[in-house]
Amino acid sequence: MDETATRRLKIDPKLYEVGWEQVPGSVILTEQRAYEIAPGRVERIKHSKPKKADYVLEYQGRKLAVIEAKRDEVDVSEGVDQAKQYAEMLQTRFTYASNGDRIWAIDMGVKDAKGNYIIPSTEKEVTRFPSPQELWQMTYPEAHPWRDKFNLQPFNRDGGRNPRYYQENAINNVLNAVANKQERILLTMATGTGKTYTAFQICWKLFQTGWNKDRVRSEELGVRSE
């Protein structure tokens, strides 16, 4: 069967079985829901296609994993490279490739600030997808009250605008640093990447969660363009 049928008849039921979109706070973002990782770009003469993940699994306000789907007649290994690419772009630790019959799980590992692996990357075949709670525990083994508060606070979507993937990564990275009590944070973004919008969303989440009821000093959220 083709990929659309494979997803509808084989992959979707496997996700529902373990609680996705059944457990409160769990969301499956798909191409049909217009989940676009990166918009298309004009490159010389031709226009490149936008990058769209087949599935992005979100729970408690955070994107936790990507699933690259292939039709059931194709070997599951053909989706692995794309699954890894999307995981790197979205900064999710876990990613999967599936043809509906088999599921290949990839743990992208954890790196320190210098890019050295703290937890090595691993791959293996699994019999099912993790539940929302399991995937959350895999991603965040230790509880962290402020991180969870920041995650659960929705972005300000006045005007119907959503953060692009790199803006969301920047917002989450800054808020993780705040949650970990890092005293000074420097956010460096290139010209034209939405520095003001990104800084606004950071401040929005800080104020809405009550992290600082007085004010956020600009020195604590240094935003510099390159």
Label every model-predicted segment.
Residues M1-A65, K70-D214:
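ATP-dependent helicase/translocase motor core
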Residues V216-E226:
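Short, basic, low-complexity termini and linkers enriched in Ser/Thr/Gly/Pro
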